[in-house]
Amino acid sequence: MDESHIRNFAIIAHIDHGKSTLADRLIEECNGLDEREMKDQVLDSMDIERERGITIKAQTVRLAYKAKDGQTYYLNLMDTPGHVDFSYEVSRSLAACEGSLLIVDSSQGVEAQTLANVYKAIDSNHEIIPVLNKIDLASSDPDKVKLQIEDMIGIDASESLLVSAKSGIGIQDVLEAIVSRLPAPSGKSENPLKAILVDTWYDTYLGIVILLRIKDGVIRKGMKIVMMSNNAVYQVDNVGIFTPHKKVVDQLSVGEIGFITASIKELSDCKVGDTITEEQRRCSEPLPGFRTIHPVVFCSIFPNEAGEFERLREALKKLQLNDASFTFEIEVSNALGYGFRCGFLGMLHLEVIQERLEREFNLDLTATAPGVIYQVTTRSGDVRKVHNPHDFGESQDIANIKEPWICATIMVPDQYLGVIMSLCNNKRGEKLDLSYSGNTALLKYRLPLSEVVFDFYDRIKSMSKGYASLDWEMDEYLDSEIAKLSILINSEPVDALACIIHKSKVEQRGREICLRLKDLIPRQQYKIAIQAAVGGRIVARETISPYRKDVTAKLYGGDVTRRMKLLEKQKKGKKRLRSIGNVNVPHNAFIQALKIID
């Protein structure tokens, strides 16, 4: 294929600005699917994406477009997620493309994630075409949004395209702009094969499928390929493209994006960002690859049935193949048994992974309280990264604790600025900058990550009636007053309920958990003490009263000493029972108690 007739582009935007709808219209215009197969969010293949109305996985499709110059061009479209938790998917898509369509809602204007994604595109040396969507809305104001793009992003918006993805207005102009304004890929077909591994996933029938972008050379069926990170050699079984259906082709050449299968059994051989080359003619050096993304939110996931542990392990492996930013390792809990400590990019990422495990693999799971990574320095001078309360150690052995802080960018209409700033201050935030573009405030705050990952995004949305937007990036580790809150039942610590929180919140959190457990744990024959402790200090306590058996019911008067003797005997029995008996805490009580921690 002549690479001058190929255009690789990503669609980037803030969440809900119409990326997937525009992708639908482009597919429709290029006759990628017939009318019977067309549906909304056609590239969002997971049920969870359709239900939530969001894109989670970046998707690709090749379209054939006959332009006004009479030539047929092949457009490789990559639809990307808009939520901050899935920004890694955006980065990978941009690495496979030469240009981007920047979609901005003409009624909402530039939002925080718009800025974050467009800066990624600029860093990738992309040609950017601004597209103002939803121009058919009464509240649309294209001129104001053009000024906002130039003012806040710093790119020329005078030739922005005006479209309505929903009604199909301006779609032809978008296709012509892609052909005329975006560059063709560079590279030479006669060079040794050099391809970047963009994504991987597991297919029940094909095994591991690899999505790749050819930078140099050609890949075809039967060719022996090498993964340059570990020199693993495989023979290509199939080569294909997405139209958006899978379509097998003879070969992929320079500039093309497609998939291969090669009977790959080892999940560890498929590293996203790896360079793939030919065994006979290896390329001289690998491609730069992608920046390594490290998880920032951690929680433990346990199967509710002990026999499901191996199924959970296999499910996690398959999901990790499809999502390189997700990590897991085995963990053992006294209360919940065998499970895994998992790492995520944010709370939405956590929710999506848990929901996919339950839906796609039919698993019944319990998740513990989410937490972040702390930097703990012991009195002996050792520095450890800790995200599991179990590894936190005793307070008397700790010299210093640092917690991760982030730099948050919040865009908010000025009438909601006051409540948003109050929220940031309540979350221990430090204001860095405040600027305006029209009646929109651009607010920059430094905040502890632990305060942001739980409910911060939801609260910003609710306080601003949905108009505020948030983007954030990791900043640095700073000294902090952090403590491990332990929950004890009859003086025995319950590891599954321990959490790491700021010292200012230990009493409130401890009281909430103790009260919840008091309602959930059934009464026993003896008194049960539920305590929340920091080190050796008890910060909250609740007591569950015992059942009382009336041992004096059979007495008919007589000497009072007989009555006292029976009561004393009962008291000793209960004391002995309390010292040797384990409190039977129902599994459901753990699940309900963990909800309060969330």
Curated annotation (Swiss-Prot):
It is found in: Cell inner membrane. One of its GO terms (molecular function) is translation elongation factor activity. Keywords: Cell inner membrane, Cell membrane, GTP-binding, Hydrolase, Membrane, Nucleotide-binding, Protein biosynthesis. It catalyses: GTP + H2O = GDP + phosphate + H(+). It is a peripheral membrane protein. One of its GO terms (biological process) is positive regulation of translation. InterPro entries: EF-4, EFG_II, EFG_III/V, EFG_V-like, EFTu-like_2, G_TR_CS, LepA_C_sf, LepA_CTD. Its EC number is 3.6.5.n1. One of its GO terms (cellular component) is plasma membrane. Residues 4-186 form the tr-type G domain. Required for accurate and efficient protein synthesis under certain stress conditions. May act as a fidelity factor of the translation reaction, by catalyzing a one-codon backward translocation of tRNAs on improperly translocated ribosomes. Back-translocation proceeds from a post-translocation (POST) complex to a pre-translocation (PRE) complex, thus giving elongation factor G a second chance to translocate the tRNAs correctly. Binds to ribosomes in a GTP-dependent manner. PANTHER family: TRANSLATION FACTOR GUF1 HOMOLOG, CHLOROPLASTIC, TRANSLATION FACTOR GUF1-RELATED. Belongs to the TRAFAC class translation factor GTPase superfamily. Classic translation factor GTPase family. LepA subfamily. This is Elongation factor 4. The gene is lepA.
